[in-house]
Structure formats: C-alpha cells, structure tokens
Amino acid sequence: MKLPLIIFGVGVTSGAYLLSRIVAKRHPSPFTTPVFFSTPLVILALLATGIRLEDYKPAKDVMVFLLGPATVALAVPLHKNWRTLVENALPALFGLAAGSLSTLIAAACLAKLLALSPAVVASIAIKSVTAPIAIELAPIVHGDPTLAAGFVIATGMIGVMLGPWLMNLVGIRAPLARGLALGTISHGQGTAQAIHEGELQGAVAGIAMGLAAVLTSLAGPFALSLVL
C-alpha cells in the first residue's frame, strides 16, 4: 500500500510545483512564487483524497533524499563560474558577513523589543540557516529546535516571495548580488529561486548558503549573548 501512496505523493507534489511555475511565469507576483503557491495545492489535494499527513510522509522522505543529489549538482554551475566567483570573492565575502550578522542581530533585537521569551528570541535569530543546522544550533543558543525549524521555513518562503520583487524595485540587477542575497538570507529556498534566475545566481547562492550557515553557527552564540 505504501508504494502507490509514495508515487501519488511525489506526483502530486511535483505536479503542484510545475503548475505553480507556469502560473508564476504568466502572472509574476510575490504570491505566485512556486514554493508559496504550490503548498496550498498539495494540502488541498491531500484533503480532497483523504490522505493523512502520516501517509504522505514516505513521499516526503523520498523527496528529501533527492535533495542530496540536487545539492551536489550545485557544483556544476559553481565550476562553470569559478573564475567570476574568485574575481569577486572579497566584496562577496564582505556582503555575506554583513548580511548574515545583520539579520541575526536585527531579528534578535526586534524579538526582544516585542518582549518575547529568550527561547523565542534565540530561535528566531538563527532563521537564516538551513533547517538541519538550525535544529542542531538551537539548543546551543538556548532556543527551541521546533520553533527554529519553523522560523527557517517561514524565512525561506518570505525571502523567495519578496526578495526578487524588492531587488527589482530598488534596481538590483547584477546576477552575483542577487544570488548572494537570496542564498545568504533565504538558504535552500533562496538558492532554488536563484538557480531559476540563472546559472551564476545559483552558483553564488549555493556558496552563500553554506558560508552563511557556518558564520551564523560560529558567531551566533556570541552575538546572542550580547543581546539576551
């Protein structure tokens, strides 16, 4: 019984994403970005067919497994654009450090101003790393792993929805700058959006995602000790 459910789950998810890509291409908007638009489609499909979330989990596990080869595949555009990346390494590293630290400190300060609990402050501060890293980092900074993972997912989705739109609004067209911003702030989802924009954007976003996670993991505990 599991195999048909897995095939159905993967098919529905892939179909919802492809449909969302078509809608986003014809009607570009922050609300038609594939990740945001496809999520309710999958939920509606599960509700309509009466499939429980527990039954959908094996299909989700298959797609999560495929993230591994997809991540390794980022090495291809990275290799093709290696010379450009090396030539712009210094300003890119400066921008990455500024983006990672500013989003960490700004999120923590805002959460503290709203009188949120220290656990929530710590969890929201590390929102711009990937979910697996956030889950491991949360206990170190006295945050909640479940909350941290939720904030990571929300950050990625909001970044993909609003990031390209805001960059277009303020006239940021340079592929390197766009990829750096998406990868630093919106991690995996931002990298997927960057790959959709272009090969160079995807290569830069992939590097930015990894380095931002390392920097946040190293600097996060110290920065939060100053805020909390």
List each language-model region with its residue ranges:
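Helical membrane-embedded segments and adjacent short helical loop/helix-boundary regions
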Residues: 2-13, 17-79, 84-95, 99
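Transmembrane alpha-helices that form the ion-translocation and gating core
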Residues: 94-134, 155-172
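Alpha-helical membrane segments and immediately flanking helix-loop junctions
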Residues: 120-147, 151-155, 173-211
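Juxtamembrane boundary at the C-terminal end of a transmembrane helix
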Residues: 218-228
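Juxtamembrane helix-boundary/capping and inter-helix hinge elements in multi-pass membrane proteins
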Residues: 28-29, 51, 79-90, 114-119, ...
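Structural signature of hydrophobic alpha-helical transmembrane segments
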Residues: 1-13, 57-72, 117-126, 146-154, ...
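Small-residue-rich segments of transmembrane alpha-helices in multi-pass membrane proteins
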Residues: 36-48, 68-73, 94-107, 125-135, ...
